[in-house]
């Protein structure tokens, strides 16, 4: 400890290594601002170590800076970078729930998938291959998007190991379109493609926060026909979602599930930095209730998508995204509660 403290001012010392040494922990720990200035160091998720492989990790943060699947406002390619920057405010423990993820899991930031910004099918292939290796290693991926197209190749990799998975999907939109401008892959089709390929256990899919105008009288017909549970935003207004999540936990059982959280599920008053905003959405409090309500489920992966920082000069949308990813980490199966 004396040696470490002697080198506190050295830029060569990794902040997370400092925290690990000072605490005597064998896990990676987000550094305390008592010892390391928040604006300093490499911009990684929660200032965790950056490594190129998930070998030995229990969970990892991965960025996918892709937005060529967007249909309205672009900019989600910058989501991972801004989420990481805002995550410097996050700390080691979650006092509200007692979760101690960094006393339970070995976690690191493994950088970004090298996507092809000029070819969406090629990007999907790259994502699928990258995640196949991550999932095969036994590591749970927590993904920083990127537009919602990315969930399709991620679930291809996840289902290859776990079989059809349950899904907790928070979004303003169903993302079950058949195609757009003749293209079957974009951010409005990921879950249609997942159904087509048998990647989802449709009896264990719930979509929460859906709203907005539509091109058809019943915008949710396809989802209901597949057996998805559809929870409209109007059903969530002015109420706690704790009772809903009790029902969701019963529905999901103990089989593998995936959490996909589109930031536009939240009302744009809280999260304006997104590409396809819809009014009258969920609140940050309800977002916490949804994620915390997944505690005890067999979560095999998570993503937080559609943060487009250019539309939010305050940085609050990216800050929300960073906090929600931390909350997802806190409900992973092996996380201890103090």
Where do the language-model regions lie?
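Short helix/loop capping segments that flank catalytic or ligand/cofactor-binding pockets
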Residues: 70-72, 178, 216
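Aromatic-lined glycan-binding groove of carbohydrate-active enzymes
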Residues: 204, 213-214, 219, 253-258
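Catalytic cores of soluble, metal-dependent hydrolases
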Residues: 2-66, 72-142, 149-151, 157-162, ...
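Glycine-rich phosphate/diphosphate-binding loop of Rossmann-like nucleotide-binding domains
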Residues: 197-199, 211-223
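Short, structured patches in soluble enzyme cores that scaffold and shape functional sites
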Residues: 169-172, 207-212, 232-234, 306
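Active-site histidine-anchored catalytic micro-motif
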Residues: 125-126, 136-204, 208
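Active-site environment of divalent metal-dependent phosphoester hydrolases
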Residues: 175-177, 213-215, 309-311
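Short, surface-exposed alpha-helical segments at coil->helix boundaries
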Residues: 77, 188, 216-220
């Amino acid at each position: 400890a004396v040696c470490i403290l002697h080198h506190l001012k050295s830029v060569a010392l990794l902040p997370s290594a400092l925290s690990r040494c000072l605490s005597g922990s064998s896990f990676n720990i987000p550094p305390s601002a008592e010892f390391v200035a928040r604006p300093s160091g490499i911009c990684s998720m929660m200032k965790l170590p950056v490594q190129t492989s998930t070998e030995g990790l229990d969970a990892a943060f991965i960025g996918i800076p892709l937005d060529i699947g967007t249909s309205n406002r672009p900019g989600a390619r910058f989501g991972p970078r801004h989420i990481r920057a805002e995550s410097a405010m996050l700390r080691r423990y979650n006092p509200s729930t007692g979760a101690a993820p960094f006393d339970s899991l070995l976690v690191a930031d493994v950088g970004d998938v090298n996507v092809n910004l000029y070819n969406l099918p090629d990007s999907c292939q790259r994502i699928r291959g990258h995640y196949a290796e991550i999932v095969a290693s036994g590591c749970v991926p927590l993904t920083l998007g990127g537009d919602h197209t990315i969930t399709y190749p991620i679930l291809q990799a996840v289902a290859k190991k776990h079989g059809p998975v349950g899904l907790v999907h928070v979004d303003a939109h169903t993302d079950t379109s058949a195609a757009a401008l003749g293209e079957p892959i974009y951010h409005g089709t990921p879950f249609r493609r997942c159904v087509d390929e048998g990647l989802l256990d449709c009896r264990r899919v719930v979509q929460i926060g859906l709203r907005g105008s539509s091109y058809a009288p019943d915008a949710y017909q396809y989802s209901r026909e597949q057996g998805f549970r559809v929870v409209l935003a109007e059903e969530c207004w002015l109420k706690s979602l704790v009772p809903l999540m009790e029902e969701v936990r019963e529905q999901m059982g103990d089989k593998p599930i995936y959490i996909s959280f589109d930031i536009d599920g939240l009302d744009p008053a809280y999260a304006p930095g997104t590409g396809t905003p819809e009014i009258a959405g969920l609140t940050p409090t309800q977002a916490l209730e949804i994620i915390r309500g997944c505690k005890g489920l067999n979560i095999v992966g998570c993503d937080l998508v559609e943060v487009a920082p250019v539309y939010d000069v305050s940085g609050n949308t990216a800050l929300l995204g960073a906090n929600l990813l931390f909350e997802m980490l806190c409900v992973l199966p092996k996380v201890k509660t103090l």
